[in-house]
From Swiss-Prot:
CC per GO annotation: plasma membrane
Record's subcellular location: Cell inner membrane
Principal subcellular localisation of the protein: membrane
Class in the EC hierarchy, top level: hydrolase
Gene Ontology molecular function: aspartic-type endopeptidase activity
Catalytic activity: Release of signal peptides from bacterial membrane prolipoproteins. Hydrolyzes -Xaa-Yaa-Zaa-|-(S,diacylglyceryl)Cys-, in which Xaa is hydrophobic (preferably Leu), and Yaa (Ala or Ser) and Zaa (Gly or Ala) have small, neutral side chains
UniProt name for this protein: Lipoprotein signal peptidase
Keywords, ordered alphabetically: Aspartyl protease, Cell inner membrane, Cell membrane, Hydrolase, Membrane, Protease, Transmembrane, Transmembrane helix
Pathway this chain belongs to: Protein modification; lipoprotein biosynthesis (signal peptide cleavage)
């Protein structure tokens, strides 16, 4: 009951005309900080773990820090098609991010705007990885899946969009 009320309030906060620019500016600043954090954390773990690829540092029973290059898409799908995969996924990811950049301009509610922003920031960070390294660096290892902060941003943004469109549209 309380969760439904919170979701209802979040879905109905408008990007009002009076403070629209301010809300968008704060979201952009926050999103830029998330992008920088993701890139810095990846850079740290790339340099820290580069001498021991394949070795995972156990933090908790099902939580490890691993050194994994993902040349494909989620869960390593198409990982073995490196030659054409990186360029293909770089182009596809860029097109998707640009489409979402268009959608964010149409956002009427703050939740919708911020959800799109998370997906854009996550996608952009993974595009930067592909441009710099030819693959996406994943390091957060939770039981059976390995991902990075950018993937988490995309996941959370997508969940927020599902919530938004489930309750509002």
């Amino acid at each position: 009951m309380l969760l439904e009320q919170v979701i209802y309030i979040m879905c109905n906060l408008e990007v009002s005309k009076n403070n629209s620019s301010r809300n968008k500016l704060w979201s952009l600043i926050f999103g830029t900080q998330l992008l920088i954090i993701d890139q810095l954390v990846k850079s740290f773990f790339i340099n820290f773990l580069k001498k021991t690829p394949g070795i995972a540092i156990s933090i908790f029973k099902y939580f490890k820090i691993s050194y994994v290059w993902n040349y494909g898409i989620s869960f390593g799908i198409f990982n073995y098609y490196y030659d054409i995969g990186n360029i293909f996924f770089l182009i596809v990811n860029t097109i998707i991010v640009l489409c979402i950049c268009y959608l964010i301009t149409k956002a009427k509610k703050l939740l919708q705007f911020n959800a799109y922003m998370l997906v854009i920031i996550g996608g952009t960070s993974n595009i930067i990885d592909r441009m710099l390294y030819g693959a996406v660096f994943d390091f957060i290892d939770i039981y059976l899946i390995i991902f990075n902060l950018a993937d988490l941003y995309i996941f959370v943004g997508t969940i927020l969009l599902v919530i938004y469109y489930s309750y509002y549209e």
